[in-house]
């Protein structure tokens, strides 16, 4: 499985974030989770799972609507959150080498990740790293709606994974969805550094220099890479 990806990369890092809001240059990451996959004896194998609450900036807090959505409270962050600088170091370790970064709605997560690294780490660790957005893939495979929970249901995974709006659950759900996508049509490598966006809304967040953006309708008639 994922033969085309592992022909190009030594490591896949599938990740997800939970944040205090939607504005990547103002709001903050409060949880970062990732699964690191490498080939071991020719078999894709999870070699590391990472899930960490992230400390807030001085005076920061988790808004009530985010507490309700995620179950993460300001008190949780105060008691269990790691400093941003430490989380940034952990991420740098995960993505070193010939690594592909993957996420569901990667534009959102990468925008937040870049700004956290800019403030508290080294954004250069993302330079030269290829990216794959599984939301773009799913839009090509199924009609609207396109939330992660929609993909979970479409691929019959509801009894195996959950879209709980906790990063650790969502990243495991993303891995399961990705596996089903690969079984369905093994063309994930065609979406590397190719992100779709809804024409009505444009590209959300800061455009990523290494990514090609193409308008993608809600009900795609052909793969975006054609």
Stretches found by the model and what they are:
Residues 1-4, 175-226:
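Acidic two-metal-ion nuclease catalytic site recognized across multiple nuclease folds
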Residues 1-118, 122-128, 149-165:
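Conserved non-catalytic scaffold segment of RNase H-like nuclease domains
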Residues 19-21, 136, 173:
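Short, glycine/acidic-enriched loop or turn micro-motifs at the edges of active sites
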Residues 113, 137, 174-178:
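Buried hydrophobic packing segments
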Residues 130-146:
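Short alpha-helix plus adjacent loop in nuclease-associated cores
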Residues 146, 172-175:
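A structural signal for well-ordered alpha-helical segments within the folded catalytic domains
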Residues 168-169:
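Acidic donor-binding loop at a coil-to-helix junction in glycosyltransferase catalytic cores
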């Amino acid at each position: 499985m994922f033969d085309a990806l592992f022909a190009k990369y030594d490591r896949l890092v599938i990740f997800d974030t939970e944040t205090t809001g939607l504005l990547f240059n103002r709001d903050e990451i409060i949880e970062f989770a990732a699964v690191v996959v490498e080939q071991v004896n020719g078999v894709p194998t999870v070699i590391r799972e990472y899930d960490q609450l992230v400390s807030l900036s001085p005076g920061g807090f988790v808004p009530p609507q985010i507490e309700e959505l995620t179950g993460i409270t300001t008190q949780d962050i105060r008691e269990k959150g790691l400093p941003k600088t430490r989380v940034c170091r952990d991420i740098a370790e995960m993505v070193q080498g010939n690594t592909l970064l993957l996420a569901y709605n990667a534009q959102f997560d990468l925008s937040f990740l870049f700004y956290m690294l800019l403030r508290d780490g080294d954004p250069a660790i993302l330079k030269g790293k290829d990216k794959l957005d599984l939301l773009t893939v799913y839009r090509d495979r199924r009609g609207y709606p396109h939330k992660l929970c929609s993909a979970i249901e479409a691929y019959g995974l509801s009894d195996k994974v959950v879209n709980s709006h906790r990063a650790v659950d969502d990243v495991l759900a993303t891995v399961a969805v990705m596996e089903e996508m690969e079984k369905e049509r093994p063309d994930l490598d065609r979406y590397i550094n190719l992100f779709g966006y809804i024409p009505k809304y444009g590209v959300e967040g800061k455009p990523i220099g290494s990514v090609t953006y193409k308008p993608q309708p809600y009900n795609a008639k052909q793969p975006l890479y054609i």
